Amino acid sequence: MLLIPETHELVLENVEALIPEAQGRFDELSSALNKDDINTIVENMLDDETDLAVALASINENMPLNEFIVKHVSARGEITRTKDRKTRERNAFQTTGLSKAKRRQIARKATKTKIANPAGQSRAQRKRKKALKRRKALGLS
């Protein structure tokens, strides 16, 4: 596991963009070094190239990036295990409002309803029915 600098914010998209480069470096390193040596190199890279180091470590550990857990050290020296922001967002408990999925579902339903009953046609139909009832009441049809 890695100890990333406290000042660095880990963004999954940035790390994913570096995976091809990390894979190339890993292929070169794995031909000459074992897993522990590669971990040592990754730890030394953390200060300069944090995102690349995380990508390389996830490849070395054979884990998907979004599951790769990172230890975070606070200024007081407390070590906590945190996942990247996207994973935390996905796993977070919904406290208020509607979930994104529910919002999307409602939007899809609204779109279907709009297509099925366009406002102009619905209004015209109401007026037509009202006129027919009025004509019937007056005995014209």
Curated annotation (Swiss-Prot):
Nucleotide-binding among the record's keywords? no
Which keywords does this chain's UniProt record carry? Virion
- What domain of life does the native source organism fall in? Viruses
UniProt site (Cleavage): E16, A17
List the biased-composition ranges (Basic residues).
100-112, 124-141
Spell out the InterPro entries in the cross-references.
Phage_T4_Gp68
Basic and acidic residues biased stretches: 80-91
Give me the Gene Ontology terms describing cellular component. virion component
Give me the ranges of the annotated region Disordered.
Answer: 80-141
Q: Is Ribosomal protein a UniProt keyword of this protein?
A: no
Functionally, this protein is described as follows: Plays a role in the phage head size determination. About ten copies of gp68* are found in the mature phage head.
Q: What name does the UniProt record give this protein? A: Prohead assembly protein gp68
